Design a protein with these regions (language model features):
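A charged, aromatic-enriched C-terminal amphipathic alpha-helix characteristic of glycosyltransferases
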Residues: 4, 304-314, 320-346
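Donor nucleotide-sugar binding/catalytic pocket of nucleotide-sugar-dependent glycosyltransferases
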Residues: 103-152
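Glycosyltransferase donor-sugar binding loop
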Residues: 196-213, 232
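Acidic donor-binding loop of glycosyltransferase active sites
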Residues: 241-258
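Short alpha-helical donor nucleotide-sugar binding micro-motif in glycosyltransferases
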Residues: 101, 233, 240-246
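Nucleotide-activated donor-binding/catalytic signature segment of Leloir-type glycosyltransferases, i.e.
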Residues: 211-233, 297-299
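Conserved donor-binding/catalytic core segment of Leloir-type glycosyltransferases
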Residues: 155-176, 182-185, 189, 197-198
Length: 346
């Protein structure tokens, strides 16, 4: 499956096209795509330019979007930068993004917390005055049909044998505190709940030792038979096939839940309870009513920040006893909301 920001950009283009067909086009910038001539031609035919950060191969590709934004400003176009993260990025990565922040007329963010992170940056804090908030939709829509896989059959068999299957969807990196969920798994096992925790995703290689540290913690807790890491999953049909065999999802997050967590929204589409650390600030979802409704209806269960591993275990067990009759997930209108918010800045 495509990286999260790339998938977001493609879906944003499609959503804006639905609002005003023929108004927009896309330019993909990779190591092999997007020559200087391509960039000049594409930007030259536009009235405004929208760019999404962060990018995966930033060391090798960063000059291309920066060139596009610079050309756009020289042509007196409006430049909108969609910035998904800030403090969670490596400081060198943030440094390379500073020219984009300076060139942008408007910076779209999806979380008040991320905006506060930029505001307290000692170098770029003053740029936060350019920021506006938009509601983030999920990158992946639940398909009409799911796909089978050997891992799905393994999870199905585990549930049939009475195991409690706990899910964690998305890339695995330190910001998601993957090792904390291992501690929760150990608590549930000590209580006799016979858990099987499945991480549906793969490790991000940019983070040194994250996989080795994870595996060391698995061994330390003696969870070799209780933890599965799926690795890369090719399609949404296969992803949701795995989701169908999960009893509950769990995300212990040090920063707390933010409105930029698309992986949480993807998991919430399943109708399975999603247990996650509560937000750091009460205003986190004031701009995102659909996200707030998921919390109010119990699709997303908040655990107070600072809670111990036992509190997450308690929340998982309690969620299994609650009704899962949540309102239908209107994927198209989630994207319509985002497209309208960003189009208003063009």
């Amino acid at each position: 499956m495509q990286c999260g920001v790339g998938q977001f950009t493609r879906l944003l283009y499609e959503a804006i096209e639905k609002l005003d067909p023929g108004r927009s086009t896309t330019l993909t910038l990779t190591q092999s795509q997007g020559s200087v001539a391509d960039i000049r031609r594409a930007v030259g035919s536009a009235q405004s330019t929208v760019c999404s950060f962060p990018i995966v191969a930033w060391k090798r590709v960063i000059w291309r979007p920066l060139l596009a934004l610079a050309i756009a400003r020289l042509r007196r176009q409006r430049v909108v930068l969609v910035q998904h993260e800030w403090e969670s990025l490596h400081w060198l990565r943030r440094l390379t993004y500073l020219p984009a922040l300076l060139l942008a007329n408007t910076i779209v963010m999806f979380s008040p917390q991320v905006r506060r992170e930029l505001a307290r940056d000692p170098v770029a804090g003053w740029i936060a005055a350019k920021c506006v908030l938009a509601p983030l939709p999920p990158n992946i829509e639940a398909p009409s049909q799911t796909a089978d896989s050997p891992l799905r059959q393994r999870l199905k068999a585990a549930r049939e044998n009475g195991r409690l299957v706990i899910g964690h969807f998305g890339s695995i990196y330190p910001g998601k505190q993957p090792n904390t969920l291992l501690n929760v798994t150990a608590v549930l096992r000590a209580r006799g709940r016979n858990p099987l925790t499945v991480y549906i995703g793969s490790f991000i290689k940019a983070f040194d030792n994250v996989e080795a540290d994870f595996q060391a913690r698995v061994s330390e807790l003696n969870l070799l038979e209780d933890v599965i890491v799926s690795g890369y999953v090719d399609s949404s049909a296969e992803v949701f096939g795995l989701f169908g065999e999960v009893d509950a999802f769990c995300y212990p997050l040090e920063e707390g839940l933010t409105a930029r967590r698309a992986s949480i929204l993807t998991a919430a589409q399943t109708g399975r309870p999603v247990i996650v650390t509560g937000p750091a600030e009460a205003d986190e979802f004031d701009h995102h009513l659909r996200f707030k409704e998921l919390i109010e209806h119990g699709a997303i269960v908040l655990v107070p920040r600072g809670s111990d591993d036992s509190a997450y275990a308690d929340a998982i067990v309690a969620s299994l006893k609650q009704s899962t009759a949540y309102p239908p997930f209107d994927f198209e209108n989630w994207w319509k909301d985002a497209a309208e918010a960003i189009e208003a800045q063009l």
